[in-house]
């Protein structure tokens, strides 16, 4: 944006479209949890395999060169296309880059968080041996004063919260714990 002197804006559709986040923020800001000392975000990395990276001819309805845009030219593979493109560094940063902004939005909003002091992360590709590139297991620690904030990416739902689905945010306070997804909380 700076190079081309453009103004940009990032919006988060879940923040605006689903009333659950607003209700979670109200509960946390009202003090129902006490002082929140820990936020843990969990995203399931999904199924064990998404297919293989076999090269083929793009379907006739897909203008593959247009779809690639400025990304490096690569042979077409359905795995590099719709729905799974996010697992290749040429196009995305994987599940973390795709989903972190959505589920962490509620924590930033509820706790009035700004930029962390530092972030450390470790991960790799251990489970989905399908030719994709981005991590399928990942742990990130965000350093905020007085707050333990982590993001975890692993196969399967968060242990203990399987009933909540594949992406959750857990707020642990001195008085209570709250777990939320995009559409519900408890």
Feature locations, PLM:
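Beta-strand-loop-alpha-helix segment that lines the small-molecule cofactor/substrate pocket
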Residues: 1-16, 31
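Glycine-/Pro-rich loop/turn segments that contact NAD(P) or position catalytic residues
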Residues: 2-3, 18-26
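Contiguous beta-strand/loop segments that form the cofactor/metal-binding neighborhood of enzyme cores
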Residues: 5-6, 22-23, 35-186
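Short, solvent-exposed turn/loop segments enriched in Gly/Ser/Thr/Pro and often Arg
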Residues: 13-17, 42-45
């Amino acid at each position: 944006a700076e190079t081309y002197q453009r103004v940009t804006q990032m919006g988060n559709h879940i923040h605006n479209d689903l009333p659950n986040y607003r209700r979670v923020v109200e509960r946390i800001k009202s003090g129902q949890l006490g002082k929140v000392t820990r936020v843990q975000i969990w995203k399931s990395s999904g199924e064990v395999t998404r297919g293989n990276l076999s090269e083929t001819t793009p379907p006739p309805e897909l203008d593959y060169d247009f779809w690639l845009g400025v990304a490096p030219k690569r042979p077409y593979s359905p795995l590099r296309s719709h729905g799974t493109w996010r697992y290749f560094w040429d196009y995305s940063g994987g599940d973390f880059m795709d989903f972190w902004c959505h589920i962490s939005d509620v924590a930033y909003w509820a706790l009035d968080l700004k930029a962390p002091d530092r972030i450390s992360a470790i991960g790799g590709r251990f489970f989905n041996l399908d030719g994709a590139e981005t991590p399928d297991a990942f742990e990130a620690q965000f350093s905020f004063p007085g707050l333990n904030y982590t993001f975890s990416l692993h196969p399967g739902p968060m242990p203990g919260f399987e009933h909540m689905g594949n992406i959750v945010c857990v707020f642990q306070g001195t008085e209570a714990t709250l777990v939320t997804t995009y559409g519900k909380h408890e």
